[in-house]
Structures are given as C-alpha cells and as structure tokens.
Amino acid sequence: MNKCALCGSEAKLELSHILPKFFFRYLKKSSPTGNIRSTSNPNRIIQDGEKVPFLCGECEDLFSRWETSFANNIFYPYEKGEKSQFSYNSDLSKFLASLSFRCLKLAYTQDRLENIDENQVPYVSKALDNLANYLLGNNPHPKEQRQFLVLLDTAESHSGYVGGIKESEFNLYATRAIEYDVVANDIAIFIYIKFLKFLVLCPVYIQSQKGWRSCRVNHRGGILKPSSIELNDYVLHRMINGARKAINSRESISGRQSDIIKKNLNEQQPEKLANSPIAQAILKSKA
Ligand SMILES: [Zn+2]
C-alpha cells in the first residue's frame, strides 16, 4: 500500500501514465514507420509513455474523464486538421492542470529538479498544493497555476531557418515531439509539456506577467483558436533546445537501427507517407 500522489489516501496504486496513452497511440498510428523512439535513447523503440505507481483508482477515474473530453473535443479534431477553433468548458483547464500536476509531482518526488535552486523549492511545493486542491475540487480556481495552451502548426520563415535550425527540423519538433520538463531560470520556473501539435505551459513561479497573457485557458470555459501569440524568450529557447536535442538524437541512431527505419519506410505506401503529418511538416517547409 502506498499513498496516492493526488488525494494522499492509502490505496493500492495503479500504474498511471504520466502523459496519457492516447498521445503515444496517435503518434504511432500517424507515423510512417509505425514506431516511436525516445529521445534519450533513440535506439530503443518505445510504444508507450512513462508509467509509474501514482494514483488511486478514484483519482485515476477523475483524470480519465477530463482526458476523454480533451481527446474527443480538441485533440483528435485538431491533429486531423478537421477543426481549428474550439469552444471549451471547465474540463479543459482541469485536464491541463492534471498534466501539469503529474509532471511536476514526478519531477519533485524523483528528485529531477536539479536545475532548481534550493531556495526556489518552496514555490514547487506550493504549486503542487494549489494544483492538487484545484483538481480535487477544494478550490474552484488553480490560483497562480493557471494553464496555458498553445496550438502549434508548421512555422514558415523567410530564411528557411528557425532559431538557427532548419525549418523542416523545427517543424518536425513543433508538430510531432512528445516531451515534458520543469524549466527554471533566474526569473521563472515553469512546467513545459509538448505533445504533437500542442504546447502546455504552467507557471510555478514567475517574476513578471510579461509574456504570460496570451494563450491563457479560462478555468470556466472559452474559445480556443490559433492566433498571434506572445511567448517569453525563455519559452521559445526551450522549444529550440528541444528541437536541437531531437536532431542530435536522430543523428546518434546506430547504423543497424537506421537500416530498420529505412526498411520500414520503404515498405510503406507512398500515399501514407505523403499524408502523414511528418511528411506534411517537411513538405510544407521551404528547407
Ligand atoms: Zn487518490
């Protein structure tokens, strides 16, 4: 018996996905090779996300209701290009807060916050409290831990480069990568969750509201659409770094693995390749 990470009750914990399974399932289904590779060890094919004993059955059910609402109303329609404007209700803020909570709590309990100063750690525990109380319904509002959602698409630059990275490579990252991180610098700590064409941000501590106004999700509901956005330099930096890491990791794939990838690609029907979001990301870019 262990303690549930959200409600704290002693229970037999379920093996929970830190990021929902349908992200990975969709990535795999829409990938021409039908496989997913993890960035940290690109030679190992991963089919699923990270799973840890985390939540009790009740909290798992709570999260899965918001997950289903997001999957059906926003995720699939946007990924498939069927819709780009969405009216949402309170489920969206809850779902995003549940993602932020899972990522921050895991980083906190597994000591993955090595980039955070000791005197900044109290901000992390306070943010976890705010998120948990909001998710459990003890607070109607997540307080400082409001959720931000950016709808991503392929970027088109005049130079063919984005932040020093080939536009096609950047677009591949922007539309396909799945990763999460707790980012810290002198003026901000925030949760960064990137999955396919979505970027979720949640401030843990920010010195100023600058760059944190657009893309804010209202906890009651509202309209979501791709629009001109103002993002902080440190958020854009994190994206560029993520894209760079993905390129390096692809380059480090061993010869044998790269033969397997080529073989899988060769066996695919050309239409499936051209219609896959990866191919479209590359075709649409000028690089
Ligand atoms: Zn629980």
Which residue stretches match the model-derived regions?
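An N-terminal structural lobe/cap that precedes and organizes the functional/catalytic core
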Residues: 1-70
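A general structural signal for short secondary-structure junctions and capping/turn motifs
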Residues: 5, 11, 45-48, 86, ...
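Flexible coil/linker segments and helix-coil junctions enriched in charged and small residues
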Residues: 32-35, 116-121
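Short C-terminal domain-edge/linker segments immediately following a structured domain
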Residues: 36, 85-90, 230-236
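Glycine-rich loops and low-complexity Gly/Arg-rich segments
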Residues: 39-40, 80-82, 225-227
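Catalytic cores of phosphodiester-bond-cleaving enzymes
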Residues: 43-114
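C-terminal, charged low-complexity interaction regions
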Residues: 119-287
